Amino acid sequence: MKSVLLIPELGTSRKLPPLFSSALSHPLPVPITTTNYVDSPNQTPPLMDPTPTAAARRAAAIARHLAGLPSAATALQSSPCLSYAPPESTEAPPAFAPTELRALLDGHHLRDRDWLFGAMEESPLFCPRRAGGKVFVSPDYNEGKEGQREATMRRIGYLTRRGVFRGWLTEAGPEAELRKLALVECLGVYDHSLTIKLGVHFFLWGSAIKFLGTKRHHDKWLLDTENYAMKGCFAMTELGHGSNVRGIETIATYDSKTREFVINTPCESAQKYWIGGAANNATHTIVFAQLHINGRNEGVHAFVTQIRDQDESVLPNIHIADCGHKIGLNGVDNGRIWFNNIRVPRENLLNLVADVLPDGQYVSTIDDPDQRFAAFLSPLTLGRVNIAVNAVYISKVSLAIAVRYALSRRAFSITADGPETLLLDYPSHQRRLLPLLAKA
């Protein structure tokens, strides 16, 4: 047998010298011990023994690394090649009915959930490849943000054509709401950017129109929102104020002569910041601003404002900037918005809680400003809840991946000739995963 040594620096292969070749048949020698000279500063380290015996020992050690495993069979050699098999194909059938457990965990609208999963399986936008069965392929997080954003919009277009969003804003009642939440959960376990983008459009923009507006707003915008004929975003957060909504600095001044509100960004900290959908796609937004009438500040109110035309060109006197690449959710186009004397009709004020009459008179069914502010924000709670619920979807997916992997991956063997042990048979994995699985 000719032994070959690869020399990386030269990029060539050379035959081992006779010393290395002869060492292949030698047993591994006892490791060489050296004198501890650290404790004696004046003592010099011993020189390497130049005799052939020392060289042979060194050569033997290197040769054993190069020679590979000995001829004697080992547990790893006698085993077939390691390969992956889904747990359901190798484990015994469960002692319970999986369909009944699924019904218990999902709770409601099982057929609607299955219909949506089927619609996603049929589209290469969601299921572009098959690998041992139907496989959902998650978004490519190595793709640039523009590519991820385009993928999100293509998926939304496909789901719109399939009628997934039908009734999400125009139908009312517990049945319609539960069906919508079931479908959102199905989407949430697949693509987080898609879920956030839909959440901004339906649960923030759409819910503001539905729950803060009145019939004139519903008739004008709800159906177009549901059909994605218009794309909405939600401009509440500012660079200087996020959670403290009462402190926002954008100003909407009522002009009684033209019966319009004039919206302005008075300073840099008043720019609308981190607004999902604003950077690329949104045509309209809900602007939260301090309402000024005849020099009096009536507090924060919401105004429907168009920011782009139908070909997605930004309108005059509106400046929009991209928040750029993020550590996650790059399929969502977060942006920044500045307003410079943007005029919107009086009718664009969402007036369920308070209104402004044509002559500039401010009217409200709630006299106390604190109660009025609370009533103004309460319909928006659902959007906040949905963001928290997304963490539950992600936890479900993470736990499923971890358990399936632990039932497939093996590491180390208890006996010399036995199979390697499943990860889930290790107590450390059991303590981490099984309590979470039991609480699912």
Language model features with spans:
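Glycine- and acidic
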Residues: 186-190, 202-206, 268-272, 318-322, ...
